[in-house]
């Protein structure tokens, strides 16, 4: 369950209806921490212009979930919705570094993560969801400077930041950056990142003197 639930905005708005002024009160709530509704009857999670402090969304094993439309959240870096047999629409973009979802027509999950200082996104929508092109094709994207490529199963999958898929994939968006934290970005950082991306080694065991 969410760590904290609190009110962040209280608004009184006057609206004319048929020449009569009505006053409405709006109380917007904010969530902090992990939003874990896994295994519940939740049907949709949407953020129509509302920003929260949620850092992770967990909606796996939700049989009735059909829509995950959680975008432009400045603190949310992870989202997962696996084993949701009715998931028809997904819209995840913002500052995500780890996404795991499986639309109902995909035979395997979409697993996206990052290596370096970038973000990933995934957009997919069947007809009637009003998401994407509504053509059962998913759009994968990488955002950030010094993008090197998408890597999957030890080899490069795409040199383009954006590409389309019609089924699941496990891929890492690789970005050059200050991998060894020495205060500068050099070819050594890029080589180290690429080695980790293709599975030659992992980031914790890289000897940067030899990279």
Language model: regions and residue ranges:
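Short, tandemly repeated low-complexity microdomains enriched for cysteine and small residues
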Residues: 80-81, 99-105, 122-123, 153, ...
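N-terminal capping/linker segments that flank leucine-rich repeat
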Residues: 1-46, 61-63, 85-129
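Extracellular beta-strand-rich, repetitive "passenger/adhesive" scaffolds
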Residues: 28, 48-53, 70-75, 115
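Conserved positions within tandem-repeat grammars
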Residues: 3, 8, 29, 33, ...
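Cellulosome-associated attachment modules in secreted, modular CAZymes
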Residues: 172-211
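Secondary-structure capping and domain/repeat boundary segments
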Residues: 106-176
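Tandem repeat domain/solenoid detector
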Residues: 55-56, 63-66
């Amino acid at each position: 369950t969410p760590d904290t639930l609190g009110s962040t905005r209280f608004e009184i708005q006057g609206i004319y209806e048929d020449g009569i002024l009505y006053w409405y009160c709006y109380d917007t709530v904010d969530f902090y921490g992990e939003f874990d509704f896994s295994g519940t009857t939740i049907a949709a999670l949407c953020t129509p212009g509302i920003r929260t402090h949620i850092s992770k969304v967990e909606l796996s094993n939700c049989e009735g979930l059909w829509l995950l439309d959680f975008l432009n959240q400045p603190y949310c870096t992870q989202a997962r919705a696996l084993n949701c047999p009715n998931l028809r629409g997904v819209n995840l973009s913002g500052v995500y570094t780890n996404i795991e979802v499986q639309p109902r027509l995909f035979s395997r999950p979409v697993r996206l993560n990052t290596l370096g200082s970038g973000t990933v996104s995934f957009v997919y929508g069947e007809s009637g969801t009003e998401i994407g092109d509504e053509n059962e094709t998913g759009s994968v994207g990488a955002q950030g400077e010094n993008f090197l490529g998408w890597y999957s199963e030890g080899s490069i999958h795409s040199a383009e930041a954006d590409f389309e898929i019609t089924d699941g994939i496990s891929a890492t968006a690789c970005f050059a950056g200050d991998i060894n934290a020495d205060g500068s970005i050099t070819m050594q950082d890029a080589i180290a990142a690429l080695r980790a991306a293709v599975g030659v080694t992992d980031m914790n065991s890289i000897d940067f003197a030899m990279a």
